[in-house]
């Protein structure tokens, strides 16, 4: 069981931090750096000239001290700081509007280091809304995270200095969007605690197109009903959470500050297994798993072609079992962590997301980010179209979008996707070589 869970996590790259022995060889002497509420590991090149470019790598909750990116970037001549936020391994404690101050701490730190003249933010997975949130506020000012349409507004004084560049390797649109698309709208819990499933909306019902042995194929009709139902469920959850917060403010709740907020069928509280996102079972849905137009594809041999790119992601039928469990299929938040970091308004989970209703939104933030921007989608995962859309929305004049052939979410080769052994063997090398060339050409 434990081994299977590690394999699953590696597929997601949730635990780009799991492979400790391999990553520990990133440099001879990585240095642990305590920075107030932030813990960090500083990676420098073992040889060559002293670096003048620093990369910052983090995730909103995951342990990133041994992230593969720091090893690979240090190996290519950069200084890299891999760090953990104050909310490490505690999804329920997240107060999103405070998290940008942790980015500020690390930006200020690396700018103080001798020889560092440029700072590049690297936002992968849950690090993408983190880094983009900071940068959007740094460039547009604190009014960016305020307003009547926001689920939660920032309130503190935010005096942030912009970075010099930002890289999004397999960024996702935001945790609220991930929660929305991962909801199982067929699930409900009766007042007596009974778990109920509506078979007409059940993504794990073979009558709806589910295949327990491989890739599922959901009809357009089912997809339309499903995406609409996900939106209704999320909006209902938001209304429920807001109503409970009102009771707390009125002194009519059990506790004076916060309360538990549980979402059955929502998937794991962190990223990864248990999600009922249709593309996890049916990787052939083009609206999410293909580019809308010809884009650059970095092939395994290092060449670049331009074509409509389709994800080669493997299906995850095992989510059917995980989604029915408490451990892997139930999100456990508090009212505040849900509303601030894991909710988003919408009219449709596919085509009607209100990107800027949440401050945890890469899609919203890129519209205010003007520093040089590199967006790199992994060709064997779920964010090819999302990242193409980030590129389209980006306010940067200097911006680039590319897909890395055969890479899973954690950058490494998708061996389960290969038709011939070694077909995607260079995926991680190709990604970091491309980042190296991109950064050196600009900074």
Where are the language model's segments positioned?
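Conserved alpha/beta-hydrolase
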Residues: 73-90
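Catalytic active-site module of serine/aspartate enzymes centered on a nucleophile-bearing elbow/loop
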Residues: 407, 415-443
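Short beta-strand/loop motif that positions the catalytic acidic residue
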Residues: 369, 375-377
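Alpha/beta-hydrolase
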Residues: 199-364
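Catalytic nucleophile-loop/oxyanion-hole region of alpha/beta-hydrolase
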Residues: 86-120, 421-429
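Short beta-strand element of the alpha/beta-hydrolase
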Residues: 51-60
């Amino acid at each position: 069981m434990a081994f299977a869970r590690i394999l699953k996590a590696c597929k997601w790259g949730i635990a780009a931090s799991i492979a400790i022995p391999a990553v520990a060889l990133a440099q001879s002497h990585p240095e642990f750096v305590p920075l107030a509420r932030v813990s960090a590991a500083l990676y420098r090149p073992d040889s060559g000239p002293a670096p003048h470019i620093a990369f910052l790598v983090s995730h909103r909750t995951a342990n990133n001290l041994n992230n593969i990116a720091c090893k690979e970037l240090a190996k290519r001549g950069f200084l890299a700081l891999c760090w953990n936020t104050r909310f490490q391994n505690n999804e329920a404690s997240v107060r999103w509007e405070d998290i940008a101050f942790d980015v500020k701490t690390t930006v200020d730190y690396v700018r103080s280091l001798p020889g560092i003249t440029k700072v590049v933010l690297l936002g992968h997975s849950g690090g993408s809304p983190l880094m983009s949130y900071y940068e959007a506020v740094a460039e547009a000012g604190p009014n960016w995270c305020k307003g009547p349409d926001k689920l939660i507004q920032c309130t503190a004084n935010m005096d942030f200095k912009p970075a010099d560049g930002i890289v999004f390797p397999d960024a996702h649109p935001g945790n609220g969007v991930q929660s929305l698309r991962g909801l199982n709208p067929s699930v409900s819990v009766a007042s007596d605690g009974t778990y109920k499933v509506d078979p007409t909306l059940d993504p794990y019902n073979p009558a709806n197109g589910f295949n327990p042995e491989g890739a599922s194929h959901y009809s357009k009709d089912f997809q339309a009903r499903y995406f609409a139902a996900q939106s209704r469920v999320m909006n209902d959850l938001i209304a429920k959470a807001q109503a409970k917060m009102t009771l707390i403010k009125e002194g009519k709740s059990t506790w004076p500050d916060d309360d538990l907020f549980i979402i059955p069928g929502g998937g794991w509280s962190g990223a990864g297994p248990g999600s009922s996102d249709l593309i996890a079972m049916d990787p052939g849905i083009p609206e999410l798993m293909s580019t809308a137009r010809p884009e650059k594809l970095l092939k395994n041999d290092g060449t670049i072609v331009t074509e409509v790119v389709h994800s080669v992601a493997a299906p995850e039928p095992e989510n059917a079992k995980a989604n029915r469990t408490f451990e892997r299929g139930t999100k456990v938040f508090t009212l505040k962590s849900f509303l601030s970091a894991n909710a988003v308004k919408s009219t449709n989970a596919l085509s009607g997301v209100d990107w800027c209703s949440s401050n945890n939104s890469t899609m919203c933030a890129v519209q205010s980010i003007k520093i040089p921007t590199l967006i790199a989608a992994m060709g064997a995962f779920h964010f090819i179209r999302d990242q193409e859309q980030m590129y389209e929305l980006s306010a940067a004049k200097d911006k680039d979008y590319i897909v890395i052939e055969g890479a899973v979410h954690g950058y490494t080769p998708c061996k389960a996707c290969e038709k011939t052994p070694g077909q995607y063997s260079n995926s991680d090398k190709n990604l970091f070589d491309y980042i190296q060339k991109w950064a050196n050409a600009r900074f």
